[in-house]
Amino acid sequence: VNQIGSVTESIEAVKAALVSHGAGVAVVGRKINLAGGPSYTVELGRFDGLVSRALYGLSKLPELGTHGLTLICISWALRVMSNVHDFFVHVAAKVESIHQYIESMRYGSLSPTIFDNYSKDCMIAHGAAHFLKXRPPDPAETRGGAVADNGSGAVARMPTLEEYGTNLTKLAEEGKANFDAAMVKLKNFSFILMFGVLGTIISFCLISSGAVLLLKHHVFPDSNINPSSGAAITSGVRGDLRAYVVAYLDPSRTSFTVDNAIYGEIRRTVLAWLIDSGTLQLSEKVLALVLTMVAATVLGVAKSMIKMGQIEVLTGTQGEIRAAEIVVEQLHAESGKPVLVALTGSIDKMTKDNVLNKTCK
């Protein structure tokens, strides 16, 4: 616990500066949007509510006893890693795109699609993969890491935590190179703002190459949930306690990117630890909270269940998901399995709220 605390504390010490610089780049993106281009925003701390607060609440339950503090430390580690990803993908990777968009405006050839293409190429180049769209894979195909459908129907292994750290380091180096090139063309922007972004990129190099791998050794020695732990999780759920989860997918990106794989692996580690330590053995109340109240953890459980062929997968556009509750009930009745609903396309708030209320029981 002390080692985890020292690692996360050192990263948290510089996070405030990263947030400030990231917000500055988001402002640049909004200004470009006003000129007619696509909008790019940065979701800062998007897992704060889903992970940190939820795990903090769980840590206060008497059933957890002295293990509560460990959960708090793990939640902080998740939050730090979440922010590292946010700044990499939503800030650093956009600098070159902003430069390209400005160039297209300067020479009179407006091409907003350049953003989408760059975004997709960036994701694909660094290990992005599509989520399962059809059958649950054979367990023999999934040993050694999470799996994904790459769009061709073939099942591919998702990156491990160590591989993810390596990818982040590579992305940091390429992101800095892109930034250096863009700096020459972006001299009309505030030098102070650009200096701040440069500091952010450099910080990424340090964080991705050091902190992510340190967290691996100190927090997550084995990120794969074993079949016995998975069976314990699912067998302890009441028949009317449905482990549904709704995932909203950005249509301009691949369905589930590398970060989802790593967070899913970490969540499975947390659950496996809870099961193996005996914490959840006799506590249906805590098990119900983990499976139904903590959205991020439910997503990890769902992926584990898919690996073991214990969950159905449903995808659809906004028009199709208005009947999602009926479809989910039908699949659940036919298969007797929980259902993961993965929604694609743009989702309006009303539809999102309705589906969440109906399917996330």
From Swiss-Prot:
Partially N-glycosylated. One of its GO terms (molecular function) is lactoperoxidase activity. Belongs to the peroxidase family. It is found in: Secreted. It comes from Aloe vera. InterPro entries: Haem_peroxidase (IPR002016). GO terms for cellular component: extracellular region. It catalyses: 2 a phenolic donor + H2O2 = 2 a phenolic radical donor + 2 H2O. Its main location: secreted. One of its GO terms (biological process) is hydrogen peroxide catabolic process. This is Peroxidase A. Keywords: Glycoprotein, Hydrogen peroxide, Oxidoreductase, Peroxidase, Secreted.
